[in-house]
Amino acid sequence: MVELDYLFLGSVGFLTIALMLIILRIIKLYFDEKQARKRKEALSAMAADEHAARNERDVVVVGGRRVQTARRRVRHNVDDGNNDDMGFVRNAIDQNGDISEQEDLPSADLARDEHFGKKKLAKLQAKEERRKQREAELLEREERKKLEQEKEKRLQKEREKQMEQEEEERKRKCREREEREKREEEEYKKLRETFAVDEEGFDQTDGEESQNLLRDFVEYVRKTKVVNIDELGAHFNLRTEDAVDRLNFLVGNGTLTGIMDDRGKFIHITSEELQAVAKFINQRGRVSKAELIEYSNKLIALESRCVEHVSELTAA
């Protein structure tokens, strides 16, 4: 309850202060308007007095000029004796025109004063418009600067995130490469060991003999071209599974190139033959499966033949 009372009293006090400020603002506006009205009335009265005095002064002057002009006209008519009454009439008309022009002067002065007031008001309004325009431009620049800063922060975060992702990707590829190299090294060691020590009848050999056996294995596959897996294992005193493992390893590391068919045979394909098939496809653009098989049989020697024969077919 005490907290509610404090909140209630605070709200009442805030509303009271706001109401007082509004009332004071209204009173101030009222007195400002009243003073402005008084100043305007005083200026109008002063202008009217000044115009009246000027009018009276002009009338006297005009009267004097009219009398003098009339006297001059009379003397001129007496002396000359040749002019008629039309000259006097024209003179009177000219004097009346002068009087009308003098009477129109106060109206012109009043219009000029009003014009000066409107001009000053327009000047103040233009000044206020320029001030508002400057404030709007300043606010717009600040808003644009704020947006640019936010955009720069967002781009910086995106760049940092991208750099982190690239670093993670680099580390991942590095780990995969190390694991692959390690696995290949282990498989290579295992392959050398199986060539060096064989359970089917090979005696233990040294590293040089193991290398020779591996080289003989590769040369046998290349020369035979179409290798029967069972015959390959029997030739090197290996089990069929071991022979298949060795072929897969040599194909995986790029030493041999070929395919394993469903009849238990490995067909060795040289890089020249692969390039010839690729060239045939690129030249023909679109080929059918039958055409590809027929041309592949021509290019890929299924028996041990020299490379020059394949080159001749490719050139043809």
UniProtKB/Swiss-Prot annotation:
Any single Pfam family the record assigns to this protein: DDRGK
SUPFAM superfamilies, sorted: Winged helix' DNA-binding domain
Main function: Substrate adapter for ufmylation, the covalent attachment of the ubiquitin-like modifier UFM1 to substrate proteins.
Positions in the Cytoplasmic compartment: 25-316
Keyword Cell membrane among record annotations: no
Region annotated Disordered, chain positions: 147-187
Family, as annotated: Belongs to the DDRGK1 family.
Protein name: DDRGK domain-containing protein 1
Compartments it resides in: Endoplasmic reticulum membrane
GO cellular component: endoplasmic reticulum membrane
Main subcellular localisation: endoplasmic reticulum
Keywords carried by this UniProt record: Endoplasmic reticulum, Membrane, Transmembrane, Transmembrane helix, Ubl conjugation pathway
